[in-house]
């Protein structure tokens, strides 16, 4: 037929075969064209949405174009950021085409751009000192889980924190000799945190600008009560991760009534537990679910995964495209917690700190993946953060 030869011989294919209103499976000649585009060696650029992809769900309607690039017209659609849609879209580029704002914006979401991160990150003043770069407190670790406290501390240090204190239990305090820059102290005599330790920890925390709580804490009932004491009494910013998220659900903590500014960093499984939903439901409604949760609880939510979604309490969300499969290893989330805490300590508000922290964390992994796609560790990612930060702030 007339269209076969160009598809087989062209260098670039512009896909504008089907628009955003697709409601049934693709068939007939259109299906044949999509199959030929996917079999072609040419670069494929889809206009607004890859043909055959549902713009609302991100699911292929029978079959869909596997684009190298997708140009989102006037607004991002759910398929650009939801799985599996984003895999069909390739790299998503944004283009305004002059539509009124009310018509153009169908989804309150934006992709995080390197330029935006560079503009958000604070520049160091020539005369600054460690006291101006944030005193970070990390409540983490339990017997056998000291590595989580270590990694969160590493993340904070390499993200530029002025001082980092790790508060843990005695058996996890062995990290004190691993990183001399960490100020490690222990409380109590138990293998895990208990509610009886809350008062001492809060007294220590009076000196801190921001807290991070959760990595490696464990899920003992006493630890859950300890977490509730901290969250309901701490009045400064706090990053809530890992086992502390489990306590939020089990102790029925009303996040909207907590006095501090909260940043929650669950992965899909943790968010499913937190909301009483299945992991499949969370993935299917990754953006809308994150936005609803952040607005209802008045928190900043970092829903980790591919892609990571940062939802603000004003109802807007940001989608991160940095990061790669090599980062699917233990401890990556602990490192991210430390990075975000460090940025909050550098006088960033929770929302931009989460945006920048997630982007830098993923970019650090991407830089490592250029040399070693698989096999690098969370510690390696932490050590790469200064280079990633330098890259995004270069003129």
Residues of each region from the PLM?
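Conserved catalytic network of the ASCE P-loop NTPase/AAA+ motor domain
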Residues: 5-6, 39
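Small-residue (G/A/S/T)-rich helix-start motifs and N-terminal tracts that mark the onset
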Residues: 7-10, 80-238, 242, 246-263, ...
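Internal gly/pro-rich beta-alpha loop/helix module
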Residues: 11-12, 17-108
């Amino acid at each position: 037929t007339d269209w076969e030869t160009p598809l087989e011989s062209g260098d670039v294919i512009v896909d504008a075969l089907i628009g955003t209103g697709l409601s049934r499976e693709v068939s007939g000649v259109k299906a044949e064209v999509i199959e030929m585009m996917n079999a072609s060696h040419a670069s494929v650029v889809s206009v607004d949405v890859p043909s055959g992809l549902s713009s609302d769900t991100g699911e292929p309607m029978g079959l869909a174009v596997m684009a190298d690039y997708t140009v989102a017209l006037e607004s991002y659609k759910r398929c650009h950021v939801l799985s599996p849609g984003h895999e069909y879209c390739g790299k998503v580029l944004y283009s305004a085409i002059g539509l009124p704002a009310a018509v153009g914006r169908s989804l309150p979401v934006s992709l995080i751009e390197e330029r935006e991160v560079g503009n958000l990150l604070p520049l160091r003043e020539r005369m600054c000192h460690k006291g101006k770069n944030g005193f970070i407190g990390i409540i983490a670790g339990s017997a056998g889980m000291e590595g989580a406290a270590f990694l969160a501390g590493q993340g904070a240090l390499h993200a530029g924190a002025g001082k980092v204190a790790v508060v843990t239990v005695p058996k996890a305090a062995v990290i004190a000799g691993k990183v001399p820059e960490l100020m490690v102290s222990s409380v109590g005599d138990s293998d895990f945190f208990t509610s009886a330790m809350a008062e001492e920890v809060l007294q220590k925390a009076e000196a801190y600008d921001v807290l991070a709580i959760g990595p490696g804490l464990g899920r003992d009932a006493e630890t859950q009560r300890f977490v509730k004491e901290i969250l309901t009494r701490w009045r400064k910013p706090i990053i809530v991760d890992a086992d502390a998220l489990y306590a939020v659900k089990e102790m029925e903590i009303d996040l909207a009534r907590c006095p501090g500014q909260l940043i929650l960093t669950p992965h899909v499984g943790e968010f499913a537990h937190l909301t009483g939903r299945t992991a499949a439901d969370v993935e299917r409604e990754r953006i809308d679910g994150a936005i609803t949760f952040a607005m209802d609880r008045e928190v900043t939510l970092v829903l980790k995964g591919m892609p990571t979604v940062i939802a603000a309490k004003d109802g807007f969300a940001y989608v991160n495209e940095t990061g790669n499969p090599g980062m699917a290893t233990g401890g990556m989330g602990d490192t991210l917690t430390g990075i975000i805490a460090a940025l909050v300590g550098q006088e960033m508000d929770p929302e931009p700190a989460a945006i920048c922290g997630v982007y830098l964390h993923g970019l650090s992994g991407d830089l490592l993946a250029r040399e070693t796609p698989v096999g690098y560790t969370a510690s390696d990612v932490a050590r790469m953060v200064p280079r990633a930060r330098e890259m995004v702030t270069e003129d």
